[in-house]
């Protein structure tokens, strides 16, 4: 169970759950695009990169990275409605990740982007994989930051049926909806999400400012989603970054083997372990993430 919460980082309040004011005017996208599920702002110039945050996260979890990248790349920072203080819109009910992936695909098409790179952290990684597998013609490169393609199998016993996973997801959703303010599991997991103390209040604020039903439904969707059968449809060069969860009861070698097995359906994917980092690699090891992203952009 502890393992599950960690990986769900973005699926948790984790993915950078920070509640932020509207972006400055110079960050606002000048591209006409309307959606009741996501919004996008742009920064910088150069090859296009779409950055997708995770559960309960604001796009500002990418701010430090964006500061370093905007001189070389044009960044498209996605915000999923319902998280970190934003009204849920169409995300008030039902699935969140799959519809968000479709909306990002529509954004790419309607704004005329030419197969941009897509980078997703935690739940954002799930969204990015959905987009790359279901619309491979739209994605030029793909980076998944600390997210397996089948979250449910990471915290259920080996051999569990899809129905058993769904029952677990139902239970977790009910728990999120019933939790008293400030006592939810996400808040309890924040210390294991980043080593940078100054970033933890951001994650707490994002979690507390998120729409409860949107969070619960998004988390449920992540648990029951298994993208392993779809990985072979991804044609873009792909990099997967992962960390060993703190206090993990699983030996490192076993965990590494599990991650590689999970991505066996994407044989061209480069699976990279990031040392000395918790779930928010963009906070704990930004230089390493940037180096891996630059390498991916050269592929």
Where are these regions (language model features)?
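C-terminal motif of bacterial Sec signal peptides marking the signal peptidase cleavage site
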Residues: 14-16
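Conserved HGGG/HGGXW glycine-rich cap/lid loop of the alpha/beta-hydrolase fold
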Residues: 36-89
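Active-site loop/oxyanion-hole signature of alpha/beta-hydrolase fold enzymes
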Residues: 76-119, 123
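Conserved hydrolase catalytic core segment
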Residues: 114-156
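Flexible "cap/lid" loop of the alpha/beta hydrolase fold
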Residues: 142-176
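Conserved alpha/beta-hydrolase catalytic His-Asp/Glu region
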Residues: 153-159, 175-232
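Conserved loop-alpha-helix segment in the C-terminal half of the alpha/beta-hydrolase fold
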Residues: 238, 242-277
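Catalytic histidine-centered segment of alpha/beta-hydrolase-like enzymes
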Residues: 277-286
């Amino acid at each position: 169970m502890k393992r599950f919460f960690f990986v769900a980082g973005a699926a948790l309040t984790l993915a950078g759950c920070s509640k932020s004011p509207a972006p400055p005017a110079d960050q606002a996208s000048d591209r006409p695009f309307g959606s009741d599920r996501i919004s996008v702002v742009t920064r910088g110039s150069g090859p296009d990169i779409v950055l997708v945050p995770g559960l309960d996260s604001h796009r500002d979890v990418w701010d430090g990275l964006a500061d370093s990248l905007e001189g070389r790349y044009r960044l498209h920072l996605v915000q999923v409605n319902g998280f970190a203080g934003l009204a849920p819109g169409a995300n008030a009910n039902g699935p969140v990740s799959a519809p968000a992936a479709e909306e990002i695909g529509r954004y790419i098409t309607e704004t005329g982007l030419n197969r941009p790179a897509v980078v997703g952290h935690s739940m954002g990684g799930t969204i990015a994989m959905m987009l790359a597998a279901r619309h491979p013609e739209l994605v030029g490169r793909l980076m998944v930051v600390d997210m397996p393609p089948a979250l449910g199998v990471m915290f259920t016993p080996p051999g569990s049926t899809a129905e058993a996973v769904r029952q677990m997801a139902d239970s977790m959703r009910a728990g999120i909806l019933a939790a008293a303010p400030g006592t939810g599991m996400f808040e309890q997991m924040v210390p294991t999400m980043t080593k940078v103390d100054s970033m933890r209040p951001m994650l707490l604020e994002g979690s507390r400012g998120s729409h409860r039903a949107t969070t619960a439904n998004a988390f449920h969707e992540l648990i029951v989603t298994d993208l392993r059968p779809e990985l072979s449809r991804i044609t873009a060069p792909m990099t997967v970054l992962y960390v060993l969860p703190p206090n993990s009861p699983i030996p490192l070698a076993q965990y590494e083997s599990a991650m590689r097995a999970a991505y066996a359906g994407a044989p061209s994917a480069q699976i990279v372990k990031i040392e000395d980092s918790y779930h928010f690699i963009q906070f704990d090891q930004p230089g390493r993430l940037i180096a891996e992203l630059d390498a991916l952009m050269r592929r």
